[in-house]
Structure formats: C-alpha cells, structure tokens
Amino acid sequence: PILPQKWYFKNSIDYSISLNYAVLNYAARYKDELLYNIYTMGRHSIEAGSKDSWTLYPKRADALSELLKTEKPTGKIDSFQLAVFNKVYKNPVTRDPRGYIIPINQSTTAIQFVNILIKSGIKVHRASSDFMVGTKKYLSGSYIVKTNQAFRPHVLDMFEPQDHPNDFLYPGGPPVRPYDAAGWTPAFTMGIDFDRILEDFTGPFDALAYGDIQKPLGKIINSQYNSYGYTFSTKDNASYIAVNELLNAGEIVYKNKEQYFVRHSDKINNSITKLSTDYGILFTNVTTPLSDTLKKIQPIRIGLWDKYGGSMSSGWLRWIFEQYHFPFKLIYAKEIDSVNLNANYDV
C-alpha cells in the first residue's frame, strides 16, 4: 500500500516502467514455457473445434444450480450429480458450432465484418462454387469460418451472445454493473446474416491468405436496357457513401422506405458505375418511373463540436463521417457562443 502523499505524474510513469521491466524479466526467464503454453492453447482450441464441445457459460451454471434444487437423487450421489451435469452441459442442442457460414447474398456490411475477422488473425474460407450444408444451399463466394483453429475463443466472441454472470449485490438486490463492456457481438451489432453449423461440414472451400482483405463486388442489374434511372437499397451502409457522393456532386437523390433513386443521365451513369466498382454497391437499372411516392433528399449541414487539442468523442464521430463521406465542419466554443447555429447548421 502507498502512504498518503503528494503525487506527481513521474510517480505514475515510474510505476509503469517498473511493471514493464517485471514483464520483460518474466518473459526472458520463462520464454520456453510461455511459447509452449501459447502452442498448447492453440492446439486445445483446434481440438475443441474438431469435436462436440460446450462452453461453460454462466447461464448454464445457473441452470445447473436450479436443476439440482428440483431433481431428486437416485442411487449414488456422484452418479446423480454427473447425470444432472450432463443434462445441462452435454445437451446436443447447446453444443458450440463447428463453424459459421456467411452467405454472400447480403449487404456490403458482411464483407466489412469478414475483414474484421481477417485483420484479427482468424482463418476464413471462401466457397469456390455453390454448396449444400444439410438442406440449405449456399452460393459461390459465401464465407466460412471454422472453429477448429487456434483463435477459436475469439471466433466464438465474434459470433455468439456475450454471457455475463448474474451478479447481484445481495440476494434480491440490485445488479452489480460489469467492469467493462457487457454486451457487444459484432455479428449482431453489424446485422450480419449467418448460420451456426453444429455438425462438421465440408465443401468447395478455399482458405484465404492471412491479411487478404476482401472487397465487395458491386454491379448494375439490368444494365443492358434503356434507363429511366437507378435504384439502390436503403439497408446497405455503403449506400450512404453513394448518396453523399451524388449530393456533393449536385445530383438529385430521392428515396422511399426501401430504396434510393436517381434519374438517368450520362453523368449519373458514370458516377453509378464508379460507385459500384469502388464500394461494391448493388444498383438496379429501371426503365419506367417508380410507382411508390418518392421524397427528395436535402443535403444536410453538419456542425461537429470539437475542442482545441482534440476530443475522443468528437474524433470518433469525425471518423464515422469521413468513412461515409458526410460533409461536416468542426465548430469550437467561440463559434458556438457567437453565431446563430440554426442559421448555419441543420444538425
């Protein structure tokens, strides 16, 4: 323990340096054991993903506790406890998946998710032709993530619900908040369509090289016909890039609940072709006016608060705006206090 005293930033730095030296010293002394343990963990993960396995989630521990309260022992207590344990932890329905399949026929966000997996060192396969798993057909180009790999725990974290224990201050009392992030699963938050496969499966799968970042393949459907205009989905995040690029170029963009629409012109045709190629956006050429009511989209004037020296929250929003090509202007306290913001900005 540290006695109460005047504290300087140097003290904190000294603590960090001493900790760094301790870690380096430990690694130097036990390098063989550390490297072998890393290998062993990877081997165990591969073995677990190659057979029926169950993760010991907190919810299953709770289910086991409840079952032990209601089940009555018959015979030896050890045999009874094992039988109850197997009811919960060896239930075939609750097995961990042998792998996940990400169908190719969905939005470009699925490719972004696949790239997250690739960047974190997860082995990903891609189907070279159509294939069947069970009774379901998957198209060529679909992505496959098997769990018989060294980073299996991370694979499960990317696809499975986060399961935190029910931690209460006292029985019947308020819950104790988790120390850190309590519930984010990228496959859920990104809205990815995927299937959990509980049985071992094979197919025409090609392993992607580590670091082989994927690019969505866009196209223009019905491009061979005379064009009245083009539609593209409101459900694809990449569509925001297309809308902002078109608006920034002075084009008129319309939308209804399901799709955006732009009228055909030689200039629009060139823009659509480039957007489809660069960002993998799927456009559909239409030959007649749409029957649905369309609303004209107005360009939006965004003012983004920031402070001199930078702000983490402002920087995050700025990064998001830049990724999807939203025009914005940084505003600081002086401007906020001295001008009519409503006259200069919409949001």
Task: Give residue ranges: language-model regions.
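Intrinsic-disorder/low-complexity accessory segments
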Residues: 1-347
